[in-house]
Amino acid sequence: MYVLAIDQSTSGTKAIIFDEKGGIVHRVTVYHKQYYPKPGWVEHDPEEIFRNTLDACRKVIEESGIKPLEIEALAITNQRETTILWEKKSGKPVYNAVVWQCQRGASLCEEIKKRGLEGKIKEKTGLVVDPYFSASKIRWILDNVEGVKNKAKQGEIAFGTVDSWLIWKLTKGEVHATDFSNASRTLLLNIHELRWDEEVLEIFEIPPEILPELKSSDSVFGYTDLGFLPKKIPIVGVMGDSSAALFGQGGFYSGDIKVTYGTGSSTMLNIGEKPNVSDSPIVCSVGWVVKETSSYVLEGNIHSAGDTIVWLKEKLGIISDPSETEKIALSLENNGGVYLVPAFVGLGAPYWRSDVKAAILGLQRNHGKEHVVRAALESIAYQVRDIFEEMVRISSKEPTEVRADGGITRNRFLMQFQADILNIPVLVSNIEEVSARGVAFVALLHLGAFSDLEEIRQKITYREKYEPRMGDELREMYYEGWKTAIRKLLTE
């Protein structure tokens, strides 16, 4: 028994085959193009993403040597918030996918805030009014692509996050659905009642006719043969990437916390079966609905984590490969008072300031590129602590360890600095593809390979454990330097 998992991320699409114990058999990655039509705008081509998905699935099966008949289910995890609208009749997108990083909805969000509606929306959806989430992206497409608004009102247009788009295409238009974790990131879901909220839809002027059906992550979302399998298999195990990462790390219980380090970063705390919506900028979302039980999470997202390292390479040209940053950072005894605030598309949680620009502070004549590299790595850890402290304040939960995943967890400097700056141990996943493993676990649970969540948790092991070893005085000195840098930018 095998499960094929699709992990559709910001940079590319992975197809991964898991065995019945949740172990990786084989993986294939296909990257897609990034489009930046204007400063602060980011787009993907939905058709390219679907083609790449089919290519990755075909290749991973061929290269693995597994018989196609042995694959029992298809699971999907995806970049969240990214918004696609398409014609129901033709299945063709009306515009490119507007990516989660894209800031084009900023003016609409500001207008809604000025109308005094943010509190009401936060209470219902658990989210802050920000262009990061799907609602303002949907509205932009409706307002700016000719003819789409009228077609939407007539029920001819479908909206979906990437999971919905793939499910629609894989089922040849038979199923238009999403799961609650993805829906809760649109800024349109009432997280208390688990339904689309009519009042919020009216505020954003979004017709309900375009919305997908809501399903639990362990529902069967339809059937597909991917265009080449000898039989149709169920699509089961659908979850947004950050929720899937928490699930894949075994974060099933209240108080469990994980940090996913990707292009951006997601810090997510399981808070149990009831939402906790506060006036804090930390958002509350649906982690998942599995076995008819809802798990809610507090989440803080930062826009630039791995993306900051890519910037060092592609724009500054001071590294030729991201792996060099570890050695460069370790060559310094300290940070020299240099701080990089990577607000390339504004600041995410807990500040939510889309107007702030990136800056390097504290540079002096004796500083070199190594100080900038170290400051870039440190910025990731500081942003995670900003979120962590706010989560502890809201939830009154004191996590005793952090589960970490994502490509840059291989950077030993960053992981040790993260443990030091949080002052709790960091457990690093033994695989990078924890989001895919999360949805594979859901599919395997559905197929009967596991009896319950605890059995899954016992299967999870970690590659490394980083214990904090920095003194209290030094820790707080570093962190206060970061807070000072942030204050300067926020008050400019």
Curated annotation (Swiss-Prot):
Highest taxon in the source lineage: Bacteria
Catalytic reaction equation(s): glycerol + ATP = sn-glycerol 3-phosphate + ADP + H(+)
GO terms of biological process kind: glycerol catabolic process; glycerol metabolic process; glycerol-3-phosphate metabolic process
GO molecular function, one term: glycerol kinase activity
EC number, as in UniProt: 2.7.1.30
Function summary: Key enzyme in the regulation of glycerol uptake and metabolism. Catalyzes the phosphorylation of glycerol to yield sn-glycerol 3-phosphate.
Source lineage: Bacteria, Thermotogati, Thermotogota, Thermotogae, Thermotogales
Name of the protein in question: Glycerol kinase 1
Enzyme class: transferase
NCBIfam families membership: glycerol_kin, PRK00047.1
GO CC list: cytosol
Binding-site residues, glycerol: R80, E81, Y132, D241
UniProt: ATP binding residues: T10, S11, T263, G306, G407
Binding site for ADP: T10, K14, T263, G306, G407, N411
Entry keyword DNA-binding: no
Residues noted as binding sn-glycerol 3-phosphate in the record, renumbered to the chain: T10, R80, E81, Y132, D241
Pathway: Polyol metabolism; glycerol degradation via glycerol kinase pathway; sn-glycerol 3-phosphate from glycerol: step 1/1
Alphabetized UniProt keyword annotations: ATP-binding, Glycerol metabolism, Kinase, Nucleotide-binding, Transferase
Activity modulation notes: Inhibited by fructose 1,6-bisphosphate (FBP).
Primary gene name: glpK1
Family, as annotated: Belongs to the FGGY kinase family.
